[in-house]
Regions:
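Aromatic-anchored segments of alpha-helical transmembrane domains
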Residues: 12-20, 82-90, 176-185, 232-242
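Membrane-helix interface linkers and caps
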Residues: 23, 31, 40-85, 91-113, ...
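Membrane-helix boundary elements
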Residues: 175-199
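N-terminal membrane topogenic signal
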Residues: 1-10
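Hydrophobic alpha-helical transmembrane segments
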Residues: 116-143, 258-260
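Membrane-interface helix/loop boundary segments of multi-pass membrane proteins
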Residues: 147-177, 219-223
Length: 290
């Protein structure tokens, strides 16, 4: 684990500096400057990666899994993100009870806006289809480009540091590091505005569960680019469940809440069973390989 401490010091240090600046200036995450700063934080793992490579006198951007040979796992990873979102919608409906409605205020506004733009009545399934299709295209383009800033670190440089260790233990470690890295922004209201302190621990769980999915597809595809596409697409569709709510609970609802935990567990278990009984590679229980 060469230079792991340096990598963590840089990636964590930069986001705490950014979060501290937002806090001291009273800049909210829902403001334009706040959005710009929060989005820029996604570059910090890449910066940490490049600094570590420079210190080690390694070629920059090498050995972090940048491979452009497309295989079926590129598409599997990309399309899994709407599946996770759909599962999260189902579990949100289960947890939310009367708070869940197909006539919620947000959904009604979306439907009215689309009806006016397209000059036709759009059914509920049409709104969902529009949301997922636009999310898929955002995920494979601008969102993937931004998400690469994180994935070059988490599923690139950091994955390499854990190479040779047990896949699942590496996923837990990398996921926990990734989730905790968000702490400064979580404390400022990102993802869990109602429960910022509890949200820090919730985000660690999200990070671990999501890492099992990202890391498995990263290994199967052989490319960190796929992880960036998955991350970008996930960000685009993760909050879809929230449009069905008249009143939300950030610890329960959507991909960041318990509904998301359940959705990720379903997908994670499905991948584990596929790995164990279909391909019989047993990646989940084997030493990690890029």
């Amino acid at each position: 684990m060469k230079n792991l401490k340096l990598y963590l010091a840089i990636s964590y240090g930069l986001i705490w500096i950014a979060g501290g600046a937002l806090y001291l200036t009273g800049t909210g995450l829902n403001t334009i400057p706040g959005v710009i700063v929060a989005s820029s934080c996604m570059l910090f793992p890449l910066i940490a990666t490049l600094v570590c490579q420079a210190v080690n006198k390694e070629p920059l951007f090498r050995h972090i899994g940048i491979r452009w040979r497309v295989n079926r796992w590129w598409f599997v990873g990309w399309l899994l993100m709407p599946v996770i979102s759909l599962l999260a919608i189902g579990f949100t409906w289960w947890f939310a009870g009367d708070r869940f409605s197909t006539h919620s205020e947000i959904l009604t506004l979306m439907q009215t806006s689309l009806n006016e733009q397209l000059k036709m009545d759009i059914p509920l399934w049409g709104i969902l289809a529009f949301t997922f299709v636009s999310g898929l295209f955002a995920g494979i383009s601008i969102n993937a480009l931004v998400a690469f800033g994180e994935e070059a670190g988490w599923r690139g440089y950091l994955l390499r540091q854990f190479e040779g260790r047990n896949f699942s233990l590496a996923a837990v470690a990398i996921g926990a590091i990734w989730g905790l890295w968000h702490a400064p922004l979580i404390l400022l209201g990102h993802n869990y505005p109602q429960h910022p302190v509890a949200g820090v621990f919730m985000m660690i769980v999200v990070g671990v569960l999501l890492t099992f999915v990202f890391q498995y597809v990263r290994v199967k595809s052989g490319s960190v680019i796929v992880a960036a596409i998955m991350h970008g697409t996930y960000n685009a569709v993760a909050n879809t469940a929230l449009v069905f709510l008249n009143e939300s609970n950030d610890l329960l609802d959507g991909c960041a809440g318990l509904a998301g935990f359940a959705a990720l567990l379903v997908v994670g278990v499905a991948l584990f069973l596929f790995d164990r009984y279909v391909t019989r590679e047993r990646i989940f229980t084997s030493p990690l390989r890029q």
